[in-house]
Amino acid sequence: MKKLLTCCFVLAFASVLFAQTQTLSEPNPETVGADSAMMSLREVSVDKFEREGSWNVHMSPDNGVIAARLFKGNPAMKEPLPEDEGKEDLDTQVLGVRVDFFRRGINSFNIMAGRPMPVEGTVKTVSMWVCGRNQSHDMYLLIQDYFGRNYEVYMGNLGFSGWKKLTAVIMPSPDGEHGIVQSSAYYGDKPGFKILGFRVDCNPIQAKGSYYLYLDDLRAVTDLYDLENRDEDDMLDNW
């Protein structure tokens, strides 16, 4: 009997530890801004980095030279969305970025979308697969909220080698006016924000020589409850 109780205790402790590890490794969109029991979370594709010329790169010409282009490749750990199953032949490329630094110092570079990319609904998280080169630079997501105000959200440190999924958590506005606002009852009925691109702040010690970075599969987890539960005969405030 004592051995049975000991085994049960060990199994219970292991399951709790595994759950905590999962929670710490990746943000749970269901708990981000969960002020209502009514949610309809959906993971949507924002961009697959398949179109040449749809992304632009910039950095100060005093600090170095930057270039970007598409390459054949894919993260092996990436799981396709349900609507993309069977269409793997349409998702075969990644965006490669190369930076050649002139000297070590406080540098940064931007990876910007050709045009702002809207994401409908109340966005909880934004994720992207990044192939790093084990240099301790920091990546930020650049967004524009419902009122056209620009914000940056920390995605993670690039001190790893190979592919890794980075996730930015979008914290809700506390009062509908401050912070990242995604909806307003006074100015329209379509919640969401726009993704402008990314900024990488370089570690001054490691910003030398050539640096390579690869991006793929930009996604968002968004709450579409308000959009999916509109009455069919409701009027649209878009005039």
Predicted regions and their residues:
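Short, Lys/Arg-enriched, disordered terminal segments
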Residues: M1-L5, Q20
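Beta-rich carbohydrate-recognition modules and glycan-binding surfaces
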Residues: Q20-W239
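Sec-dependent N-terminal signal peptides
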Residues: L4-A14
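Sec/Tat signal peptide C-region and signal peptidase I cleavage site
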Residues: S15-A19
